[in-house]
Amino acid sequence: MELYEAIEKRRTIRDFENEAIPSEIIERIINAGLQAPTNDHMRDWHYIVIQDKNTVIKLLDIIPKGISDEDMEQLLKDWNLSDCEQQSAYRNAVPKQHKMLMDASVVVIPLLKQKTDILHPDNISHLNGFASIWCSIENIFLASTAEGYACTLRVPLGDEDKYAKGVLGFPNDYFMPCFIGIGKPKKDASIIKQKDINVKDRIHWDRW
């Protein structure tokens, strides 16, 4: 698959088939993540790839398994989500946070070595490592798409990252930015409508 085709086809998917991913494909996808630009040229990234369902069950035990309609509406108000398309996307995504990762063929936990306090940076340069790992994550999304798979993602809420550390045993100086689920999309998987944006409306030549 050509690069621009993979970029165009990449979508966050939350409905997966029950289908294993060959280990060599997983390694290609993770290797694509390792090719991302890195702030200090050290690529101090590691990836925990979880295929064992018992481990996945334990890892995800802290994540809510659903949300009531009343709580969903309150969340939209609390987060000031007033756009109709945005509300529709959240109504689809929030109830699936547990199931989407449980049903994925693998769950990947990307980790970066913390050399600064990412959650309490002194300046924007202290976020360089955090920015780099997200470049790696995007490569994983695009490589998964190119291989015929799709990804879903959850950023840890509350103590989910600390809980994950207890389950998976990664070192204290490594930071977990997200959970990634990778799998084969179901034929009827929900595709969230994206905002239609004309690139010409977002480019400012030479100055704003």
Q: Which residues does each PLM region occupy?
A:
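A glycine-rich helix N-cap at a beta->alpha junction
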Residues: 68-79, 168-192
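C-terminal helix-cap and adjacent tail motif
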Residues: 5-12, 175-208
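Arginine/glycine-rich "motif VI" loop of SF2 helicases in the C-terminal RecA-like domain
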Residues: 39, 145-146, 172-173
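N-terminal amphipathic, basic helical "cap/leader" segment at the start of enzyme domains
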Residues: 1-103, 207-208
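A general secondary-structure junction signal
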Residues: 49-51, 112, 184
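Small-aliphatic-rich amphipathic alpha-helix that forms the alpha element of a beta-alpha
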Residues: 28-29, 33, 106-166
